[in-house]
Design a protein with these regions (language model features):
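Alpha/beta catalytic cores of nucleotide-metabolism and tRNA/nucleoside-modifying enzymes
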Residues: 1-129
């Protein structure tokens, strides 16, 4: 993206849907475009922390949590067992249910990523074990 911005002479970049599940995208784009700083990849735990904050802010502004299902799906993209967790997300209807589920997801992600780092297979999804 930085090469295209500098090479084309454009003065702006349209980020669009890149923001979904990636609240860092504006800071990352700025750092890359102006400083050439490489964009760091965020860990799954960092993404889940951002999801918690997003859910909390949503709940404070609009206690009806139906939109939160969409937000949660964005943040789960690419995580171990993401499809199984998204199936659980659609069953959540309260803030408390969402937060408890995010805690469960984090525990699972930590175990899965540790297994991958050790060269071991990813354990089965907790609800399938």
């Amino acid at each position: 993206a930085a090469e295209h911005l500098h090479g084309s002479g454009a003065s702006a970049v349209f980020i669009a849907r890149g923001i979904y599940g990636n609240p860092w995208v504006f800071g990352d784009a700025r750092a890359l475009a102006f400083d050439g700083t490489p964009v760091p990849s965020r860990s799954s735990v960092e993404r889940l922390e951002a999801l918690r904050e997003h859910l909390t802010l949503t709940h404070e502004l609009l206690p009806l949590m139906s939109r939160a299902r969409t937000y949660a799906s964005w943040y789960l993209k690419g995580m171990p067992h993401a499809a199984a967790w998204r199936a659980q997300v659609v069953r959540c209807s309260t803030y408390e249910e969402f937060m408890a589920l995010v805690d469960d997801i984090e525990r699972d992600v930590v175990v899965c990523e540790a297994a991958l780092a050790a060269g071991e297979p990813v354990p089965a999804h907790p609800l399938e074990a």
